[in-house]
Amino acid sequence: MATLIGLDWRRIALQGLIAGVIGGILIDAFLYIALFLPQHQPVTALWLNVSATATGHAVANPWLGVLIHFCVSIAWGIGYAYAAATRPTIADRPFISGPVYGLIVMIIMQFVQLAAGVKLQLTATGFLTVLLAHCIFFGLPIAIYSNRAMRA
């Protein structure tokens, strides 16, 4: 069991913040290219979706969507940075732990959406796109950045 006393919380928070921003940018870029661009929708449609989902469709503001999405991404980034700091096995294997972490994030966020009353109408292609987005374009970059930041 890892001890909390010897942890460098400032470094974990900064590392998680940067990793979360990187993951947030990459997952947004991938989801936009895969889901919104083919339908000729602007990138703001992605963030409108986030804000509408988070507020129960009471507010649909793209800037609120960006803020919410990056706050959540940063929180997940800090979560990974903490896990990597306390579990060397996670930190040493970013190409395994990153996609697994992305899968965990995806599953938990699907439950969050269900709890918020959002109907998830994913086709098989949509599901695979969201799975790929979370595992490869979110979890993996967070893990790779965290691995390199811990070595520095």
Regions found by a protein language model. Name each.
Residues 1-9, 146-152:
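Short, charged juxtamembrane terminal tails flanking transmembrane helices
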Residues 75, 133-147:
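Hydrophobic cores of alpha-helical transmembrane segments in multi-pass inner/ER membrane proteins
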Residues 38, 111-131:
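Interfacial helix-loop-helix junctions of multi-pass membrane proteins
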Residues 7-38:
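N-terminal signal-anchor transmembrane alpha helix
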Residues 14-16, 85-104:
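Internal alpha-helical transmembrane segments of multi-pass membrane proteins
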Residues 37-58:
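Membrane-interface interhelical connector segments
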Residues 102-112:
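Mid-bilayer segments of alpha-helical transmembrane spans in multi-pass integral membrane proteins
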Residues 64-81:
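Hydrophobic alpha-helical transmembrane segments
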